């Protein structure tokens, strides 16, 4: 069904009314920018955020800057959906996503250089994930890119599942000081478009995830504590 409805013909039988495509597209990109940022702590209301983006207003605080960055990043992704997965692409997406929001501006668009990073429960502040050492990040990203750019894989993996794996692995490694969740979701969005799932542009993935954020976080946790069985994370995505 995903192949049929998300990647089917864009012609006259499309489920998107041709007369309203631009309106739907703009609305969807704005929604994605808002919800992805709000999941990471942006406190601006949807009404204020929409007005800022639609009127091209200058962001007035960090929350608005996060949403503005997310919107700019999505537009960049749409323009670069045919690119190969690379360290350069990942760093550029992170740079756009975190522009003017990092405690140290130099951390935007570069891998973390220490292990002073953990993933905490937002309420209890309990550590729920300790990422791999920063020393392993460059090689991990190189291996990830090589795997997903392989034109003749030994085993077929459905493109949607491959996109989910990219989402999970970037989140798991936490290659950046901040902005890992936003960047991981953006890379999933990019991969879906790259593989021809054009309807992704018209749907806010983060809005769907935000509605089930606890299940989203549990899917990460269950995967890690059960021998890195990514089936939990895949099942969550396919369900929502």
What kind of feature is each model-predicted range?
Residues 1-240:
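FIC/Doc superfamily catalytic core
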């Amino acid at each position: 069904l995903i192949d049929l409805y998300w990647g089917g013909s864009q012609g006259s039988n499309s489920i998107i009314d041709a007369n309203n495509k631009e309106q739907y597209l703009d609305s969807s990109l704005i929604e994605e920018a808002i919800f992805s940022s709000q999941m990471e702590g942006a406190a601006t209301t949807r009404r204020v955020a929409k007005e800022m983006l639609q009127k091209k207003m200058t962001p007035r605080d960090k929350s608005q800057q996060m949403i503005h960055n997310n919107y700019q990043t999505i537009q960049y992704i749409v323009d670069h959906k045919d690119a190969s997965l690379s360290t350069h692409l990942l760093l550029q997406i992170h740079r756009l996503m975190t522009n003017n929001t990092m405690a140290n501006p130099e951390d935007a668009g570069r891998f973390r250089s220490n292990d002073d990073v953990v993933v905490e429960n937002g309420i209890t502040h309990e550590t729920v994930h300790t990422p791999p050492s920063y020393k392993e990040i460059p090689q991990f990203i190189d291996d990830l890119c090589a795997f997903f750019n392989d034109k003749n894989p030994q085993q077929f993996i459905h493109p949607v599942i491959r996109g989910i794996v990219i989402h999970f692995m970037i989140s798991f490694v936490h290659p950046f000081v901040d902005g890992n969740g936003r960047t991981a979701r953006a890379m999933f969005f990019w991969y879906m478009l790259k593989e021809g799932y054009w309807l992704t542009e018209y749907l806010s993935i983060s809005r769907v995830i935000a509605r089930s954020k606890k299940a989203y976080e549990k899917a990460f946790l269950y995967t890690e504590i059960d021998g890195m069985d990514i089936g939990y994370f895949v099942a969550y995505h396919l369900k929502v």
